[in-house]
Structure formats: structure tokens, C-alpha cells
Regions:
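Active-site mouth of glycoside hydrolases
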Residues: 1-215
């Protein structure tokens, strides 16, 4: 699978109604771990059902779902079930889905062993982006890194990407793949080889949908 031509991209775009929507996360989710973990799943889906109905009512027709590697790492089977539930609810409410496979927002920091965030009850921190406090002075001194920059984690990250893309490569409910959200916004030029590796991983699964990376 190669990069689409400009004509093919415009033909695809013009074949769709005006795409309008939002990044979707239920209002009862303290953060993205809360969105994707199995803990509290039934309650999360009830709220998502109501709020995706609101999306439909106000004229949205597409939403972005941003994956969470730390949850997938700890609950890979359950994670795929939760993803399917979200996509099914979106389809029920006439919302196509853009799946975001990686983003540089709130990368882990440091040079020691990576420890994924604990699952279970998540605490709200009102007034901050995605319910998380700003970095402390000590945290700011630590170097941010992408999971793909750690060899032991990179293999697992690629496995997650391939697993998700393979399952939905020919699914009409998926509008497109946001392979990398805002590459370089945190780690600058270090994002370039990661971008290449992720595009290779996605394209190896031969998705029929377009693949994007927004600046």
C-alpha cells in the first residue's frame, strides 16, 4: 500500500458529506484510562450511548477515538471488546469513527523502567486537560519519550496498532486512520522515524481507509 495520489484523496473527500464532529470521551470518564479499561465498563457505555445521541441530534456525523496504549498493554483482549462497543455505539448514532493510533499528549517521562498507570478507580482533577494535573517541577526536568522509543515497548505498540488496524481495515464504520496525532509537538524531530514505522505498520494491514498524520 502506497501514499494516495492527490486526486484519490480529493475523490475520497468529495464522496463524503461535510465531516463534522469531536474527540469523543464520555463525561463520566476521569481520563482516557477510564474510557478504555474494563472497570466500570457498563456505566461508561450507558453514558456514551446518551452522549453519542446528543452528537447525532446536533448534527455531528463523525468522532475521533484516541487509543490508550497503557490500558491495551494490561488488558489487550478486553480492550478490543471495549473498542468494538464504542464503534458500534457510534454507528448506532450515525457517527463514523476516526481512530487515533498515537498522540504526543502527556507522554511518559524519565529514563528508568516504564510502569503503566494503575487501572481501577480514576480520580477527577477538575479544570485540567483530560483530568490530569500539570507537571510538577521535578517531572518537567525528566525527558519525555514516546513508547516507540523503547525497544521493549515498541514491539508491543506495533502489535497493538496492527491488531486494531487488521480488525477494522475493511470496516465501513471506520472513516480513516489518524496514524499519528500532531507528530513532533513534544519530541520534535524524534517523531519522524516513529511516524515512518507506524505508517509501515498500518499499511502492512492494507486498510481501505485513508491514513493521516495531522500537523
Amino acid at each position: 500500500m502506497k501514499k494516495w495520489s492527490e486526486k484519490k484523496a480529493w475523490d475520497w473527500y468529495n464522496s463524503h458529506r461535510w465531516i463534522r464532529g469531536c474527540n469523543f470521551i464520555g463525561s463520566d470518564c476521569a481520563n482516557r484510562i477510564d474510557q478504555w479499561q474494563s472497570y466500570g465498563r457498563e456505566e461508561r457505555m450507558e453514558v456514551a450511548d446518551r452522549e453519542l445521541q446528543l452528537c447525532e441530534d446536533i448534527g455531528f456525523n463523525s468522532v475521533r477515538l484516541i487509543v490508550d496504549f497503557e490500558v491495551w498493554l494490561q488488558e489487550p483482549v478486553s480492550y478490543m471488546d471495549v473498542l468494538e462497543q464504542y464503534i458500534s455505539l457510534c454507528d448506532k448514532h450515525k457517527q463514523s469513527v476516526m481512530i487515533v493510533l498515537t498522540t504526543e499528549a502527556q507522554l511518559p517521562r524519565g529514563d528508568g523502567e516504564f510502569v503503566p498507570k494503575a487501572l481501577g478507580e480514576q480520580k477527577y482533577v477538575l479544570g485540567y486537560h483530560q483530568g490530569r494535573l500539570p507537571l510538577t517541577e521535578e517531572q518537567q526536568k525528566l525527558k519525555p519519550y514516546h513508547f516507540m522509543e523503547r525497544p521493549d515497548l515498541a514491539k508491543k505498540y506495533i502489535k497493538m496498532v496492527k491488531t486494531i488496524v487488521k480488525k477494522y481495515a475493511n470496516d465501513d464504520r471506520v472513516l480513516c486512520w489518524n496514524v499519528y496525532n500532531e507528530p513532533g509537538i513534544t519530541i520534535r524531530e524524534r517523531s519522524i522515524p516513529i511516524l515512518d514505522m507506524l505508517f509501515d505498520a498500518v499499511r502492512s494491514q492494507k486498510p481501505k481507509q485513508p491514513c493521516t498524520a495531522d500537523i
